[in-house]
Amino acid sequence: MTNANVDATPLTTKPSQDGFYMPAEWAAQQAVWMIWPHRPDNWRSAGAYAQATFAKVADAIGGATPVYMGVPKAFLAEAQKVMPSHVTLVEMDSNDCWARDTGPTVVINAEGECRGVDWGFNAWGGHNGGLYFPWDKDEQVAQQMLKQHGFARYSAPLILEGGSIHVDGEGTCMTSAECLLNANRNPDLTKEQIEDLLRDYLNVKQFIWLQDGVYMDETDGHIDNMCCFARPGEVILHWTDDEADPQYPRSKAALDVLQNTVDAQGRKLKIHLLPQPGPLYCTEEESLGVTEGTGVPRTAGERLAGSYVNFLITNHRIVFPLLDPTTDDIAAQKLQEIFPEYEIVGVPAREILLGGGNIHCITQQIPSGK
């Protein structure tokens, strides 16, 4: 166990000025970060089910990449019992456990040096539709992770969650208007101003804007639940053939955009359709295990935003969520076809979905750089 309660040094320049860029997820990784789930008003049975699931995810990642887990001091003893021994536990306060959204975006340069972008965070909407209050500890998470690695820090003047962007490492950024242009994130910024900031801090050139994310996604439609890059020039889209499903118009509109766009290198995109699970719904038993608090209530019968696109690419391994016995094997087969050179590892992940996200949402990769 190590302690990370120290600030990382803020820089006054921007990554693009310094020759740094966000690499694609398939670039070599030195570590993956996770955070211990503990909110009783978001995770049933005070997080016990989620903690066991996070341990399985950490184990699946650990076969390919070292795992760090931020844990509040009060939960360290419990985490040591539950987590695999290969996981490095780091004492760290947090309001919840979404490392993708509260952790840093690590950028690299041609020499293999790593630095981190620390985005603004307001719990997916602040006082206008946000998911809990307060979020002050979450705002410190990125700094603590960067300090653990000794990386210098850029402080970006933009409210942004890591789950709202995907990049191909070759100049293209994919995102969703439903989230990034939402009035509860950066109401004073225009689309053009947001693009300019992403150019500055991700060092990208071209944007692919999908309108909406997955139906009932409480993050306001994060791209990482809806569509991702598989490799340069290839994307994977969350899909249903059922035209009566509320998801269909969202996926169809996204497909239309993807079919009529090019990436930063001028390539037309190859599009893989990954069938959705379910539809999946929260059960009464699952909803009763969540206590009342400042978090969003978990209601029986509520549709869950389940998606197989919410997987992690880490050092030639795909760690993806198992969500529905009728479609899990189809998803695994499809992923193996898309990634023939990768090991495909499924982890039962309904407990993460019940809390509002999935495997990509609870992980944040640290690129190797060198």
UniProtKB/Swiss-Prot annotation:
One term of GO molecular function: agmatine deiminase activity
Catalytic activity line of the entry: agmatine + H2O = N-carbamoylputrescine + NH4(+)
One Pfam short name: PAD_porph
Signal peptide: none
UniProt cross-references to InterPro entries, sorted A to Z: Agmatine_deiminase, Peptidyl-Arg-deiminase_porph
Enzyme class: hydrolase
Gene3D superfamilies recorded: L-arginine/glycine Amidinotransferase, Chain A
EC number(s) reported in the record: 3.5.3.12
Active site residues according to the UniProt entry: 361
Listed GO biological process terms: putrescine biosynthetic process
Keywords: Hydrolase
Database matches in HAMAP family: Agmatine_deimin
Homology family: Belongs to the agmatine deiminase family.
Protein name: Putative agmatine deiminase
UniProt source species: Shewanella baltica (strain OS185)
